[in-house]
């Protein structure tokens, strides 16, 4: 199974603690697929909502296809996510808990189809973000010291 990541939401890993991930199909038009092949997507402000038993991706941006004509797609439109019923029920029960939300983490190609990796996330507090930065800096310094010692 070949998986090629197109766009990732790096801000999500900084602002949220990812508890569980799901892979979902997405309903796209032809020009949206062509634009994603050119890496023309952005998941910065995007989120997922569940209404009437269907999952929808909102505020995601897929740039208009540069060779498209007048029938090009809207950049920020509502896009339907394709999930199994039990996955939708699981996500819906998780989101009903206080403080949890569903955030798209990445677009990727799997067997020629565009998929979205979504995560059930809890927001980080500012002190948690600082703690993560301090931890990352310590690991960098440790790796640099190890590298110097092997020379």
From Swiss-Prot:
InterPro entries assigned: SmpB (IPR023620), SsrA-bd_prot (IPR000037), SsrA-bd_prot_CS (IPR020081)
Biological process terms in GO annotation: trans-translation
Gene Ontology molecular function terms on file: RNA binding
Domain of life: Bacteria
Family annotation (PROSITE patterns): SSRP
UniProt xrefs under Pfam families: SmpB
GO cellular component terms attached to this protein's record: cytosol
Annotated compartments: Cytoplasm
Keyword Nucleus: no
Principal location: cytoplasm
The UniProt record lists the keyword Cytoplasm: yes
CDD domains, alphabetized: SmpB
Keywords tagged on the record: Cytoplasm, RNA-binding
Residues annotated as transmembrane: none
Entry function: Required for rescue of stalled ribosomes mediated by trans-translation. Binds to transfer-messenger RNA (tmRNA), required for stable association of tmRNA with ribosomes. tmRNA and SmpB together mimic tRNA shape, replacing the anticodon stem-loop with SmpB. tmRNA is encoded by the ssrA gene; the 2 termini fold to resemble tRNA(Ala) and it encodes a 'tag peptide', a short internal open reading frame. During trans-translation Ala-aminoacylated tmRNA acts like a tRNA, entering the A-site of stalled ribosomes, displacing the stalled mRNA.
Similarity field: Belongs to the SmpB family.
Protein name: SsrA-binding protein
């Amino acid at each position: 199974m070949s998986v090629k990541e197109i766009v990732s939401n790096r801000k999500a890993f900084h602002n949220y603690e990812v508890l569980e991930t799901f892979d979902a199909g997405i309903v796209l038009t032809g020009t949206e697929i062509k634009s994603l092949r050119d890496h023309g997507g952005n998941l910065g402000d995007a989120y997922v909502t569940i209404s009437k038993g269907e999952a929808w991706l909102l505020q995601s941006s897929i740039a208009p296809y540069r060779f498209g004509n007048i029938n090009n797609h809207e950049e920020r439109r509502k896009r339907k996510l394709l999930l199994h019923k039990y996955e939708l029920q699981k996500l819906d029960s998780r989101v009903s808990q206080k403080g949890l939300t569903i955030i798209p983490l990445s677009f990727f190609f799997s067997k020629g189809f565009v998929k979205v990796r979504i995560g059930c996330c809890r927001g980080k507090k500012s002190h948690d973000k600082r703690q993560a930065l301090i931890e990352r800096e310590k690991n960098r310094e440790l790796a640099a010291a190890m590298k110097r010692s092997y020379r």
